[in-house]
Design a protein with these regions (language model features):
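Redox-cofactor binding/interface segments in oxidoreductases and associated redox assembly factors
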Residues: 70-71, 129, 187, 214
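N-terminal secretory signal peptides that target proteins for export/translocation
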Residues: 1-2
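Bacterial N-terminal signal peptides
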Residues: 6-19
Length: 244
């Protein structure tokens, strides 16, 4: 049935990626197209450039070849060497923190761009800022954290004059509250690893993006996030991250 559906799409002149729900943001040089694939895996397109973020979940056979790949963390719902290979154009750079580079040694081909928390680079023509992502209090046991400071990166990328922030796995840390001029923020909200919807909403109120998109929320109620931001002036867009 899936093969038949893809065939119909092709006969209609559509890419199989059209099977994913899409969302657009007006930007200089054309709209930015956001395609949620699954959980924290997302495809971003602008002006002919394709960016794949955390290609580790969902049916990646429908994703477009990426000119740039971003990886936030070592956990399996963010990192998959096989997933990177599926969505990456030949020679496309992969941006990752040092901890991820250690994990993928010998499994992901160059070029690899390692970024540390707080660092800024332009890679494949895209300005990128690495934002700390970590837990403040939550962990598997007393005195332990699920995500330690410095291990993973959130990312702010700039496309067509718009700043998109992918938070990755994090609680509401001071570095997030200090973000400025964010147009679109992808915010996680699942327990026990990140934060509940109410806490994510309070975090968003601190740095005031124009649009907030919940992701990485399996099992959580996005309605709570929407309700908490009602009247804040922040637009909430709930996309289909868990297709059936």
């Amino acid at each position: 049935m899936a093969r038949m559906f893809s065939t119909v799409l092709l006969l209609l002149g559509l890419s199989p990626v059209a099977a994913f729900a899409q969302n657009t943001i007006p930007a200089t040089g054309g709209d930015i197209t956001i395609t949620p694939i699954q959980h924290a895996t997302v495809q971003i397109e602008h002006a002919g450039k394709v960016i794949q973020v955390d290609p580790a979940q969902g049916d990646l056979s429908k994703a477009k070849p990426g000119d740039l790949v971003l990886v936030t963390d070592i956990h399996g719902d963010h990192l998959s060497p096989e997933g990177i290979a599926k969505v990456r154009k030949s020679g496309a750079p992969v941006v990752m923190p040092a901890a991820v580079q250690t994990q993928v040694a010998g499994k992901v081909a160059a070029p690899i761009e390692v970024m540390a928390n707080g660092e800024s680079k332009t890679v494949a023509g895209v300005p990128i800022e690495a934002v700390p992502m970590y837990n403040l209090t939550r962990g598997p046991a007393a005195g332990q954290l699920f995500h330690t400071k410095g291990r993973g990166n959130g990312y702010v990328i700039t496309l067509g004059g718009k700043r998109l922030y992918f938070a990755g796995d994090t609680e509401c840390v001071p570095e997030i509250k200090a973000l400025k001029n964010i147009d679109v923020a992808f915010m996680p909200m699942n327990l026990p690893y990140t934060m509940p919807p109410s806490e994510a909403a309070e975090c968003v109120k601190a740095f005031k993006p124009k649009i907030a998109i919940p992701y990485h929320f399996q099992g959580q109620k996005t309605e709570e996030f929407e309700a908490a931001l009602k009247g804040s002036g922040i637009e909430v867009r709930v996309l289909n991250w868990y297709p059936k």
